[in-house]
């Protein structure tokens, strides 16, 4: 099973601390050795780093850890392959344009019966069930909303109903972002935590690293981190129950 990591913040924030915990699970403290990827949004653009090599000893992962890219929305993934070979085209996250925005998606789980999903003009580049499901989601969205929708809360509610359908085909944990909103849909395991003032000290579970957030933030900062399993041991993470979803915007939970 793969692992997911997402972030939503009200000011551009670096995700180095959480990413450091995640990369250790990519072949170090965890079995997810079949590649990793991370997408940072910046304005309407986004930059993605991917590598089919294990993240815990990937030079590209080290670059991302050492180069604190600040963003308000981040989606990351480490892979334990089940559908599709270990290759760059099968490495999450996947990004496609819809309604003039970059939509980024990462999936944890395994689906059956996915090959019959109709994807319209959206065609997978790789062989994963994950990318096929993403193309299907986008196709369903363009069918329901031929023009750019105004009510994004309703759009994400519709996406959650589509995720319910995919969950019937197996395990479907998902992170999805259009750069402003970050959506988390849970099929088995997904947790989140919102950090705000007064900020304290956090300690990673997977590496002997501690950070005092009060020295890294201002009193107005709000940062939500979403992960498959909690990344820190001395904080209280919220578990999303199977079949439930959360929507975050600028660090705050909106659904």
Swiss-Prot record:
Keywords, sorted A to Z: Glutamine amidotransferase, Transferase
Q: What is its EC number?
A: 2.4.2.-
Determine the domain of life of the protein's source.
Answer: Bacteria
- SUPFAM superfamilies recorded for this chain? N-terminal nucleophile aminohydrolases (Ntn hydrolases) (SSF56235)
Domain (Glutamine amidotransferase type-2) ranges: 2-251
- Short name of one Pfam family: GATase_4
Gene3D superfamilies linked to this entry: Glutamine Phosphoribosylpyrophosphate, subunit 1, domain 1 (3.60.20.10)
Q: What positions does UniProt annotate as the active site of this protein?
A: 2 (for gatase activity)
Q: One GO MF term, please? A: transferase activity
The record's annotation in PROSITE patterns points to: GATASE_TYPE_2
User: What is this protein called in UniProt?
Assistant: Putative glutamine amidotransferase YafJ
Q: Which species is listed as the source? A: Escherichia coli (strain K12)
Q: Which gene encodes it?
A: yafJ
């Amino acid at each position: 099973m793969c692992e997911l990591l997402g972030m939503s913040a009200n000011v551009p924030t670096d995700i180095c601390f959480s990413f450091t915990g995640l990369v250790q699970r990519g072949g170090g403290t965890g079995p997810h050795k079949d590649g990793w990827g991370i997408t940072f949004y910046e304005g309407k653009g986004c930059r993605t780093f991917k590598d089919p090599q294990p993240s815990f000893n990937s030079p590209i992962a080290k670059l991302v850890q050492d180069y604190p890219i600040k963003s308000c929305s981040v989606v990351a993934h480490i892979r334990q392959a089940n559908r599709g070979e270990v290759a760059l085209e099968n490495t999450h996250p996947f990004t496609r344009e819809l309604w003039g925005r970059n939509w980024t998606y990462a999936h944890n789980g395994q689906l059956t019966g996915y090959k019959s999903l109709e994807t319209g003009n959206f065609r997978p580049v790789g062989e994963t069930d994950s990318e096929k499901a993403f193309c299907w989601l986008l196709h369903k969205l363009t069918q329901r909303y031929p023009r750019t929708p105004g009510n994004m809360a309703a759009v994400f509610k519709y996406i959650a109903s589509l995720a319910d359908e995919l969950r019937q085909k197996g395990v479907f944990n998902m992170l999805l972002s259009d750069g402003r909103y970050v959506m988390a849909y849970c099929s088995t395991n997904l947790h989140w935590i919102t950090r705000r003032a007064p900020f304290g000290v956090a300690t990673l579970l997977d590496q002997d690293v501690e950070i005092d957030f009060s020295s890294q933030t201002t009193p107005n900062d709000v940062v939500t981190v979403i992960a498959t399993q909690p990344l820190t041991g001395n904080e209280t993470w919220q578990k999303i129950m199977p079949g439930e979803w959360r929507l975050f915007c600028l660090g705050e939970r909106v659904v």
